[in-house]
Design a protein with these regions (language model features):
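Short histidine-centered beta-strand/loop micro-motifs
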Residues: 60-64, 83-88, 105, 114-115, ...
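Short acidic-glycine-tyrosine-enriched beta hairpin
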Residues: 107-128
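Glycine- and acidic-residue-biased ligand/ion/polar-headgroup-sensing regions
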Residues: 78-79, 89-108
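A short, N-terminal "cap"/entry segment at the start of jelly-roll beta-barrel domains
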Residues: 1-69, 161-166
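A short hydrophobic beta-strand segment most commonly corresponding to one strand
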Residues: 93-95, 123-124, 138-158
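Histidine-centered metal-chelating micro-motifs
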Residues: 82-84, 102, 121-133
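Conserved short histidine dyad/triad with adjacent acidic residue
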Residues: 54-59, 71-88
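His/acidic/aromatic-lined binding-pocket segments of jelly-roll/cupin-type domains
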Residues: 74-75, 85-87, 91-96, 114-115, ...
Length: 167
């Protein structure tokens, strides 16, 4: 935990004794680390680990004072490759911090859309929709993306079930 956190002593002592949550156990089971901090100097230089299920390299970031309610992650898609298709029961905002590529989003009704993005793009993945990201850059390390869950959705949603959104 950061030494300059402005929290009450009571809250700080709770953080010291806080047990693992299903969410933190899931991150560990995925083979990834959670980097606790208030500030990351350069998202392009944080150490990443292979994320086998997704097919890229990643690390989760956690704002110290909010615990896991404001997690986000940095992910790198290998050059000329794609991440495995997947869906999630949380909202996700994506800020592209390097490279270029495309994303395909689809729902169970068959509606499908593909769009391109590049460095500086910001877009959202609709709740519970399938999606797949593609790196259109041919250089190693060309694409690093910061994915942030809107309003801390991912850790908090847990097992809530949501209706499929229309694209």
């Amino acid at each position: 935990m950061a030494k300059n956190a402005v929290v009450s002593e009571e809250l700080a002592s709770k953080f010291k004794t806080e047990k693992e949550t299903p969410y933190t156990r899931w991150v560990k089971s995925e083979g990834l680390d959670i980097l606790p901090s208030f500030y990351v100097r350069n998202l392009k230089t944080v150490a990443l680990k292979p994320w086998a299920r997704r097919g890229g390299n990643a690390v989760f970031l956690n704002h110290d004072a909010s615990r896991t309610s404001n997690d986000c992650y940095v992910m790198e898609i290998p050059p000329g490759k794609s991440l495995a298709p997947h869906r999630q029961l949380y909202e996700e905002m994506i800020l592209v911090i390097g490279g270029r590529g495309s994303t395909t989003v689809w729902n169970d009704a068959g509606a499908r859309i593909t769009f391109e993005w590049k460095d500086g793009a910001l877009f959202a993945i609709p709740l519970n929709c399938h999606h797949q990201h593609f790196n259109g850059s041919g250089r190693a390390g060309a694409l690093r993306r910061r994915h942030q869950c809107a309003a801390g959705d991912q850790p908090l949603r847990g097992s809530r079930i949501h209706l499929q959104h229309q694209i």
